[in-house]
Amino acid sequence: MLNMLSETSHIQQTARSFAESLRNFVDKLIDFPKPLVALVQGGAVGLGCAMLPLVDAVYCSERSYFSTPYIKLGQTPEACSSFTFPQVLGMTMANNLLLNGVALTSCQAKQHGLVTSIFPHDQFKQHAMSCVRRTAMQSSEAMQKSKELLRKSSQTQLKHVNYCECNILMERWASEQTLTNFRSFVS
């Protein structure tokens, strides 16, 4: 009995620690003053997909795909995706990704506004880096001030959503169902 209580306590502490780390990471993305660019040359799964609306540009290869298999794992949305996905993708597509675990192709992701540009897979690096260099050559001061204006009105709301999502994730990660689903998913 003591072993079970000790194990349960350890699982809860681990879930709390993971949730706090995730919350801090996502808060840093929300507050980051300089342009953030994501390059996706394969699968953007889970957090890798969920955080994309928090960056300023997403360049992907034609072979990329985007997936959030949360429900399959017994997990809930993260990285503010419960808020940003309906805004960016529309409610129907957000539901498909977050509730049904449907993956998006690169073309679907671009069509729905999750991706900025798609490049041929074999030329991805050169095209993506050309875009990154073009961004880097702009006035950094003007870029930061513009980003501040674009993000200011949603920062507080995003941080609140992040806080709520992480609290629920902490519960889910400590639940027996989610632990069983994780074990099954990994094996």
Regions found by a protein language model. Give the residues of each.
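Glycine- (often His-adjacent) and acidic-residue-rich active-site loop
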Residues: 1-24, 44, 157
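C-terminal alpha-helix plus adjacent terminal tail
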Residues: 2-4, 13, 101-107, 122-126, ...
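Residue-level recognition of specific faces of alpha-helices
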Residues: 4, 18-21, 28, 51, ...
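Alpha-helical interaction segments
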Residues: 8, 15, 56, 60, ...
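Generic structural signal for alpha-helix termini and adjacent loop/cap motifs
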Residues: 8, 32, 175-176
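Short C-terminal domain-edge/linker segments immediately following a structured domain
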Residues: 16-20, 70, 89-91, 150, ...
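Hydrophobic alpha-helical segments typical of transmembrane helices
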Residues: 21-25, 81-84, 93, 145, ...
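Crotonase-fold acyl-CoA enzyme core
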Residues: 27-141
